[in-house]
Amino acid sequence: MALERTFSMIKPDATRRNLTGAITKMLEDAGLRVIASKRVWMSKREAEKFYAVHKERPFFSELVEFMSSGPTVVQVLEGENAIAKNREVMGATNPSDAEEGTIRKVHALSIGENSVHGSDSAETAKTEITFWFSEIEIVG
């Protein structure tokens, strides 16, 4: 098993409902350690840059509006196979398809307001981590 770092974000729908602690606890209970965390209010420009990979998708403008509608909590997680473990704990993008006990099954409101985002690969994790954090902010 490999010790990895991954990026996690608690989205505005969850921060509005004061779920930051509950979601972080679910991540920690799964064996992931938070080694960097901050609460940010993403600007539309930051949302456009962060989600640029989806620029041509029909939901892009709605995604940008949603992600800039309230605070998010951005985190760096560390643990054995952290990328896969985080994705497992998050559950399927559509909460109705998510496994029982996953973050999205428990907390998501809809496929759009699905409470969390997590990196899908090591390359994406590195890009997303460096988008929000400088090396000095990550304390393992």
UniProtKB/Swiss-Prot annotation:
An example Gene Ontology molecular-function term: metal ion binding
Cofactor(s) annotated in UniProt: Mg(2+)
GO process terms (BP): CTP biosynthetic process; GTP biosynthetic process; UTP biosynthetic process
Keywords from the UniProt entry: ATP-binding, Cytoplasm, Kinase, Magnesium, Metal-binding, Nucleotide metabolism, Nucleotide-binding, Phosphoprotein, Transferase
Top-level EC class as recorded in UniProt: transferase
Annotated CDD domains: NDPk_I
Catalyzed reaction equations: a 2'-deoxyribonucleoside 5'-diphosphate + ATP = a 2'-deoxyribonucleoside 5'-triphosphate + ADP; a ribonucleoside 5'-diphosphate + ATP = a ribonucleoside 5'-triphosphate + ADP
Protein's job: Major role in the synthesis of nucleoside triphosphates other than ATP. The ATP gamma phosphate is transferred to the NDP beta phosphate via a ping-pong mechanism, using a phosphorylated active-site intermediate.
Family according to the record: Belongs to the NDK family.
Name assigned to this protein: Nucleoside diphosphate kinase
Protein's organism: Bartonella tribocorum (strain CIP 105476 / IBS 506)
Gene name, Swiss-Prot/TrEMBL: ndk
